[in-house]
């Protein structure tokens, strides 16, 4: 792997490399990358999806290499700017605390002030007390406020600017995918690099880059988001807000009007799409096909607000205050654009420099699963992102390495290459170092009913019985992967007491405990069982006895009614393709492989996998799932 990466870098080419768990993937790309970077005076950008991998790289793998390699190199992690405290914003907040915050928030602000004197890096992960999000959002680094001009310089005490300054002397820079695409936007015209003029990129956990880039290109807007920023400007009920630091009585009425119009607009959207008509959607999403489905109630008042906010600039008493004002102007301008684009579907009218229509966008309305009656979002997404990667990532005379344990379908890179526009990118696939035939046994119940709307109770009952049966084989120690939240919670209720009688604690995602805490508890309590949804199908690393049993409740096909899935399938069909075999099945197989990969993390690990979906043996496409993983013993349970 290291030789292949070094050869690719020397040739200034791009590479997809599938590297299974257990081969020492991070060392295999870091060693050649460091040598190449030092030799050619380049920077290595390592981008990951999970925080766990970032911390492993910066706290474990890189320090180890710094101690043993004969070449010296510096490495630094850069987090998103909102993770850093901005001392200037903090002082501005302290000076205006009476008009910005209530009593409890002022106490939290004072705690932050005292913490700022002792913290070494100023990141929120270093905070050792309960943090109020409202307070933190008022003092963290922001793009238009905490700039090099306002907070930089050789003697700066700004944590974010200091972190960026240290990057200039670093050979290896670790970021996450979201931050990479955010930073890349600002310098994408520089054809000699990505984040720096002379750099190259290694995307680890590369199976996630398409989704992250897609989310970055198409931001959403919710009723709660608009309300939040309006109340930060001025909260009439609490008599708090930024505008109280300026002569702005004439704007306060505009804000109240916008709050009312915001509620009315999103209420009308929800009512017309989800509560009336015979063809109303059954789920939480509704695709929008036509322009101007609702009147833009907020447009005039939003334009009025922006005009009035700009008129306040001469009244600002300091540069910090003007920067805060400008950030509000930027925020509301962006909201105005998203709203206008959604109602007029403007992205579908954009053409490239050859007057060719750009990729289609799909638009939809989404209800929050937590507050479906009140929080409504308007969303959009590109249907195909391959052009974006062709033009911006796989550029000539640059190098990008994309690596993951799951980039192929039945040992073939074609699907992943087509999705990312990397048809001409080099490819390499490594075999797993594990002996799956010795370490893993798969069980598949033959008679379990298929999930369907007309037999939910029967399916749920049988599924619960089989989960309980397989948990019993290993006496706990199981990760149970679901694709449906309601089903997971219902079965959790059914099994919790039964498992407790066997001294097996059941941990369930979505019960108020964070993902990281659930995993920590699961690792430490060897006999516990963890029920998880989408995020637990990947990025879970629990070597040893604690995870000896992986139970998949269903093959992980995407919900076919989701607007993005619908649009992607239509896009393929319109080109004469087969959307099931060219999109739905490959996506499910990749996720299936990710799920299977949770079980064996070390060559001493052993365990079982129970697949509680007999489509894998009854349907013609089932063989593609089993063929996508290493050969192991399979038992069909009668």
Kindly label every feature range from the protein language model.
Residues 610-638:
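N-terminal targeting/trafficking signals and adjacent low-complexity tails
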Residues 137-171, 181-192, 311-448, 454-459, ...:
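A contiguous, basic/glycine-rich beta-loop/short-helix subdomain that forms a polymer-engagement track
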Residues 43-52, 401-405, 476-487, 610-612:
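Conserved RecA-like ASCE P-loop NTPase motor core of nucleic-acid helicases/translocases
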Residues 445-458, 510-617:
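Conserved RecA-like P-loop NTPase helicase motor core
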Residues 1-18:
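Conserved pre-motif I regulatory segment
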Residues 29, 35, 55, 60-63, ...:
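Signature of the SF2 helicase/ATPase Hel1-core->accessory helical subdomain module
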Residues 483-510:
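Conserved helicase motor "Helicase C" RecA-like lobe of SF1/SF2 P-loop NTPases
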Residues 41-171, 178-181, 233-249, 304-314, ...:
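A substrate-engagement module of RecA-like helicase motors
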């Amino acid at each position: 792997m290291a030789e292949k990466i070094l050869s690719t870098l020397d040739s200034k080419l791009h590479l997809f490399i599938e590297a299974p768990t257990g081969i020492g993937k991070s060392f295999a790309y870091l060693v050649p990358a460091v040598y190449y970077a030092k030799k050619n005076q380049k920077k290595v950008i390592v981008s990951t999806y999970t925080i766990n991998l970032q911390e492993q790289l910066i706290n474990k793998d890189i320090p180890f290499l710094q101690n043993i390699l004969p070449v010296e190199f510096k490495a630094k992690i850069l987090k998103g700017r909102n993770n850093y405290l901005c001392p200037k914003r903090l002082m501005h907040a302290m000076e205006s605390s009476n008009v910005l915050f209530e009593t409890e928030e002022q106490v939290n602000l004072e705690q932050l002030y005292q913490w700022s004197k002792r913290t070494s890096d100023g990141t929120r992960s270093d905070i050792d007390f309960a943090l109020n999000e409202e307070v933190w959002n008022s003092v963290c680094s922001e793009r238009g406020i905490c700039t090099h001009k306002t907070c930089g310089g050789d003697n700066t005490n700004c944590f974010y600017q200091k972190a960026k300054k240290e990057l200039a002397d670093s050979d290896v820079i670790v970021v996450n995918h979201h931050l990479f695409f955010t930073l890349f936007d600002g310098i994408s015209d520089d054809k000699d690099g990505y984040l720096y003029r002379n750099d190259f990129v290694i995307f680890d956990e590369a199976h996630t880059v398409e989704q992250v880039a897609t989310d970055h290109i198409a931001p959403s807007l919710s009723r709660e988001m608009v309300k939040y920023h309006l109340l930060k400007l001025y909260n009439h009920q609490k008599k708090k807000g930024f505008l109280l630091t300026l002569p702005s009585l004439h704007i306060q009425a505009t804000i109240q009007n916008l709050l009312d119009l915001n509620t009315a607009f999103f209420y009308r959207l929800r009512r017309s799409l989800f509560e009336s008509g015979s063809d109303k959607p059954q789920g939480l999403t509704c695709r929008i096909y036509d322009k101007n489905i609702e009147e833009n109630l907020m447009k005039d008042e939003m334009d009025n607000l922006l005009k009035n906010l700009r008129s306040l600039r001469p009244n600002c008493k300091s540069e910090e205050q003007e920067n805060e004002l400008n950030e509000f102007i930027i925020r509301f301008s962006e909201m105005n654009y998203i709203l206008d684009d959604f109602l007029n579907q403007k992205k579908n009218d954009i053409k490239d420099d050859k007057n060719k229509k750009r990729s289609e966008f799909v638009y939809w309305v989404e209800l929050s699963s937590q507050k479906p009656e009140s929080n409504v979002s308007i969303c959009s997404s590109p249907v195909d992102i391959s052009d974006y990667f062709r033009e911006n990532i796989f550029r000539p005379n640059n190098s990008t390495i994309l690596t993951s344990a799951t980039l192929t379908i039945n040992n073939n890179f074609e699907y992943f290459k087509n999705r990312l526009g990397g048809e001409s990118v080099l490819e390499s696939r490594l075999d797993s170092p594990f002996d799956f035939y010795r370490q893993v046994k798969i069980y598949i119940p033959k008679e379990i009913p298929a999930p369907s709307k007309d037999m939910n109770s029967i399916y749920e009952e049988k599924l619960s019985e089989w989960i309980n049966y397989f948990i019993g084989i290993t006496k706990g120690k199981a990760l149970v992967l679901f694709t449906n939240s309601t089903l997971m919670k219902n079965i959790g209720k059914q099994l919790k007491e039964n498992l407790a009688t066997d001294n097996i604690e059941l941990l369930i995602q979505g019960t108020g405990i964070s993902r990281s805490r659930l995993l920590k508890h699961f690792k430490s309590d060897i006999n516990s069982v963890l029920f998880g949804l989408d995020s637990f199908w990947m990025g879970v690393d629990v070597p040893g006895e604690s995870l000896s049993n992986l139970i998949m409740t269903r093959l992980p096909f995407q919900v076919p009614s989701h607007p993005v899935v619908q649009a992607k399938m239509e896009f393929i069909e319109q080109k004469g393709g087969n959307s099931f075999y060219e999109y739905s099945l490959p996506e499910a197989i990749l996720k299936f492989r990710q799920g299977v990969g949770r079980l064996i993390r070390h060559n001493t690990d052993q365990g079982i996998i129970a697949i509680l979906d007999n489509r894998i043996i009854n349907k013609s496409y089932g063989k593609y799932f089993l063929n996508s993983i290493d050969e192991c013993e399979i038992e069909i349970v009668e």
